[in-house]
Amino acid sequence: RRAPPDAARAFVAACALSAAGTSSPPRGDRLDRLTDQLRGAAPMVATLAGARVEADGETLAWRREPGEFRRGQSPVLRLAPGETGVWDGRFEITANQALEIAPLVGRTASLAEPSARALRQVAAPARGALPALETADGLVCPLLQPTPGVTMRALALARLQAACGLVVREP
């Protein structure tokens, strides 16, 4: 809240970019308005460039806005056995078998029980933007339920650190 205006604006843009998994940072009046709103203590919810931000004076949460999937084309990642790919700019996924990852939005009722149970612990606005895939056990979210042959790594924090100049050398 006390950061210089240009630094605050750059940080808000980096947060939106990282949470949404996009490659072009937001600019313009919407970014300026959101930056100004976040300097205040009033509770607020806003979206910017595919990201959803919620603030209540105490906490600040950045998430992917799942409504973007309904408005545009949903990201689908198809992997061959042994292949690694990045889904929605937010998760690196490696698979031992062929699979297809797509957003959970609109499909939560179809989740296999272990994923459905774990999903209840996830903030409602974040649920639809989670990755999901079909397995022999049904629809699962590898972030919520161990999924044999699938490894997943979240990229948002690393992207934010890089956007803020905190990465000295990439691995």
Please provide the spans of the model-predicted regions.
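AMP-forming adenylation/ATP pyrophosphatase catalytic core
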Residues: 1-171
